[in-house]
Each structure stands twice: as C-alpha cells, then as structure tokens.
Amino acid sequence: MSVAPIFEGWHRTQVRLVQRLPALTAQELLLEASPGWPIWAIASHLAGARVYWLCGVFKESGAETTPFPDPFGEGWEDRLDVPRSAEELLFAVESTWRIVESCLARWTPDMLGEVFTRERAGELQRHTRSSVLTRLVMHDAFHCGEISSLLGAHGLPSMDPWEPII
C-alpha cells in the first residue's frame, strides 16, 4: 500500500497552483511578498525544494527532467535578475510534482521511518522520509498561501485548495 492517499490535500494545493500560474502576467509575477521575493521566485523556490530533498537528499531519480538537474545547485530564486515566466514556472512545478507523485506512489508506510543523512554547515543531520514529506507539504502550503495572500492583497483572484476541483 502506498502513502499517496495520505497526502490528498497536498495534491489539491498542487492543482490550484497549476491552475493559477498560467493566468499570471509578467507584472503579476513580479509582485513581492517581501523585498526581493517576487511571486515567480517563491514558486521557483517551492519547486526547487522538492528536487533538493527528494533527489538530492533521498537520491530519488528525476532531477534531470526538471529545470533543476543539480539538486544542490543554484535555484532560479538565487538569480533574481533573471525573472521567470509563467510557462517556465508551470514546467518547474509540474515536472517536480511528477517526482513527488512517483515517491508517494512507491513509498509504503513502512518506508517512512527510513533515515537519511545530509551534511549541512559541516554537521550531519538525520531525516526520515516522514519528516521530509511533512516538511515539503508544509513548505508548499506556506508558499502557496503566501502567493495566494499576495494576489488577494492586490485585488487579484487567489488560490483556495479547498474549493471543489472539477
């Protein structure tokens, strides 16, 4: 039995993001939640984090099918002088979601406790699949909420993951 059904709400957030991104204009993608973090950078950061954790830390395949073939490399949000288009962001979000879907479909509840290590700032850290999935769900939800609030604050349609998906 896979863990995919447990994460149905995460899928809803992804669907809303995929529905909303293509409708954003270049000017709307430049709206900032905080100085230096326009919507396009937030969406890019969200997508890149999936590759970092799943492909980089957990060694899952698929990074090469995304705009982030080096999971530990520079992300688009690290280059604020190169704004990304709605089309590029949609590709990033959809291609990284395919990695998420693959993991959720293959991983079982028994696999969630498996421990992986990463080195950060010279220190070894231990992470379970469960802890990283929780981190990624919360990370996506936080940044989708950030984008949604920012759009709403500017009088633009926001994203509600709990509206019925048709």
Give short role names for the model-derived ranges.
Residues M1-A4:
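N-terminal leader segment of winged-helix/HTH proteins
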Residues W76-T117, S130-H139:
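Acidic/histidine-rich alpha-helical segments that form the ligand environment
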